[in-house]
C-alpha cells in the first residue's frame, strides 16, 4: 500500500513536471509566434526604410553633386563671362586713351572716340583679352614685345591684368612674361620688353 502511494506520488510529480514542461513549451511557442513575425516585419520595414534611406541619401548626394557642379559652372561662368566696355587711360604726356583703329595700328588718342572703346573680357582668373568694339580687332603681343591686332583670338591676345597701388592697372602678356602694354608721352606704343610696371607708361585706368 505504501509502495503504491509512493509510486502514485512519484507519477503525479512526474506528470506535474511534464505538464509544467508542456505548458512552458506551449507558452514559449505562443511567445515565439507573437515575437518572431515582428522581427520579420521589422526587418522588412527596416529593409524598406534602409532602401528609402539609401535612396534619400543617393538623391541628396546627386542633388549635392549637381549643386557643386552648378556652383562650379556658375563660378567658371562668372570668371570667364565678365565683359566690361572701358577706355584705358594712360596718364603720360597730355594723357592718352588706348585705341584700336580699323587699320590695326594701335596708338593713343587724347580725345575719346569710338575706336578707344575696348571690351575687356576675362578669359581666365586674372587674365583678360582686349577687343576693339568698333574695329572688331583683338590686341595681341608677340614674343618681341610688339603690339599688333588680329581678328581672331589666340594665346598672344591674353594679358594679365594687375591692380597697382595707385589704382591703375598694368597689362602684362600672359604668354611672354615681363612684357607690358605701354604708351609713350607722345601717344605711341612702346615695346613691351623695354618697360616695367614701375613705369607710368604701363599704367592704365579703366574708364567708362
From Swiss-Prot:
Compartment(s) where it occurs, according to its Swiss-Prot or TrEMBL record: Secreted, Extracellular space
Keyword annotations: Angiogenesis, Developmental protein, Differentiation, Disulfide bond, Glycoprotein, Growth factor, Mitogen, Proto-oncogene, Secreted, Signal
Native organism: Mus musculus (Mouse)
Disulfide cysteine pairs (residue numbers): 90-157
GO biological process: angiogenesis; cartilage condensation; fibroblast growth factor receptor signaling pathway; myoblast differentiation; positive regulation of cell division; positive regulation of cell population proliferation
Residues that carry a glycan: 45
Protein name: Fibroblast growth factor 6
Subunit comment: Interacts with FGFR1, FGFR2 and FGFR4. Affinity between fibroblast growth factors (FGFs) and their receptors is increased by heparan sulfate glycosaminoglycans that function as coreceptors.
GO molecular function: growth factor activity
UniProt GO cellular component terms: extracellular region; sarcolemma
Tissue: Embryos, adult muscles and adult testis.
One Pfam family of this chain: FGF
Keyword field contains Signal: yes
Signal peptide: 1-37
Glycoprotein recorded as keyword: yes
Gene: Fgf6
Function summary: Plays an important role in the regulation of cell proliferation, cell differentiation, angiogenesis and myogenesis, and is required for normal muscle regeneration.
InterPro entries: Fibroblast_GF_fam, IL1/FGF
Family stated for the protein in its record: Belongs to the heparin-binding growth factors family.
